[in-house]
Amino acid sequence: MSDLEPAKNPEGASHVSVLLGEVVAALASGPGDMVIDGTFGAGGYTRAILATGASVTAFDRDPSVQRFAAEFSATDGRFRLIQDRFSQITEYLEDASVDGVTLDLGVSSMQLDEAERGFSFMRDGPLDMRMGADGPTAADLVNDLDHTELARILYVYGEEHASRRIASFIIKRREERPFTRTLDLAHVIERALGGRKGAKVHPATRSFQGLRIAVNAELDELEAGLLAAERVLKPGGRLAVVTFHSLEDRIVKNFLAERAGRTPGGSRHLPPVEAGAPPSFQLISSKAIAPGEAELAVNPRARSSKLRAAVRTTAPVWSEAS
């Protein structure tokens, strides 16, 4: 863990950025460099990157981060926040113009701690789950989707094997009254799964993950963001991505392996490339970097995190390769 002071959440408790020291090392930024913090949050990565002497352009679609950004804007002219999704980087920055891009994926502990955001199955709040200010809420999905689509979301995005049973319980209950609160939904999921007493993981964990990913189109956003990073990074620029579950990690792993010439890869979101396209990235490490025991002791949230990093080569972006 870095000895840099972590950013603070609204309640004053520390919001500790995961794998902070490892991310800073992977970016290897310094004075004169421009780094993109694609998931600003409470500013933990931004603070550490600024400490290296680099400038930071941060992105975040969550309006609530403005209160953290104001602190940086007031004290450091090397920082700016763009209130948008990280997949939109190319709308604001020129190709091959930045020295580093970092992404810290998924929901933050800050968002989980704020019951009114509707992400938590442990705190009662409106069934929202939106990271931004617009679009359908989790309540919209739970109350409107048919059984097939609801079960698909829980299975594909939540990796919940009891997805059909949970969807059936949800639909039966919503016929009586619509879902509006997080704990209401969590209790129905618990009943569908029989409580799973003694389980270390809450029964609603996977279902809430699936709904959150669907509400925010997180996997589509990730793949679009990786393509954007490939475009805006200079030759020698570095990409560092922290993931928290297998769906995210698989996308990042396959993208970087493919772009480094390690595997054919392939995704419905990525443009087709002819065989023999020159590698656009070189892997910094062939394996993901995991948190050490010291970090896990003080930050349990880091338990499932993985860091993958790579260096941009001089090759063109793959959509332009021939």
Curated annotation (Swiss-Prot):
<keyword id="KW-0698">rRNA processing</keyword>
<dbReference type="InterPro" id="IPR002903">
    <property type="entry name" value="RsmH"/>
</dbReference>
<feature type="binding site">
    <location>
        <position position="104"/>
    </location>
    <ligand>
        <name>S-adenosyl-L-methionine</name>
    </ligand>
</feature>
<feature type="binding site">
    <location>
        <position position="111"/>
    </location>
    <ligand>
        <name>S-adenosyl-L-methionine</name>
    </ligand>
</feature>
<keyword id="KW-0808">Transferase</keyword>
<dbReference type="GO" id="GO:0005737">
    <property type="term" value="C:cytoplasm"/>
</dbReference>
<dbReference type="Pfam" id="PF01795">
    <property type="entry name" value="Methyltransf_5"/>
</dbReference>
<dbReference type="GO" id="GO:0071424">
    <property type="term" value="F:rRNA (cytosine-N4-)-methyltransferase activity"/>
</dbReference>
<feature type="binding site">
    <location>
        <position position="60"/>
    </location>
    <ligand>
        <name>S-adenosyl-L-methionine</name>
    </ligand>
</feature>
<comment type="function">
    <text>Specifically methylates the N4 position of cytidine in position 1402 (C1402) of 16S rRNA.</text>
</comment>
<dbReference type="InterPro" id="IPR023397">
    <property type="entry name" value="SAM-dep_MeTrfase_MraW_recog"/>
</dbReference>
<feature type="binding site">
    <location>
        <begin position="43"/>
        <end position="45"/>
    </location>
    <ligand>
        <name>S-adenosyl-L-methionine</name>
    </ligand>
</feature>
<keyword id="KW-0963">Cytoplasm</keyword>
<keyword id="KW-0489">Methyltransferase</keyword>
<dbReference type="GO" id="GO:0070475">
    <property type="term" value="P:rRNA base methylation"/>
</dbReference>
<dbReference type="InterPro" id="IPR029063">
    <property type="entry name" value="SAM-dependent_MTases_sf"/>
</dbReference>
<keyword id="KW-0949">S-adenosyl-L-methionine</keyword>
<comment type="similarity">
    <text>Belongs to the methyltransferase superfamily. RsmH family.</text>
</comment>
<feature type="binding site">
    <location>
        <position position="86"/>
    </location>
    <ligand>
        <name>S-adenosyl-L-methionine</name>
    </ligand>
</feature>
<protein>
    <recommendedName>
        <fullName>Ribosomal RNA small subunit methyltransferase H</fullName>
        <ecNumber>2.1.1.199</ecNumber>
    </recommendedName>
</protein>
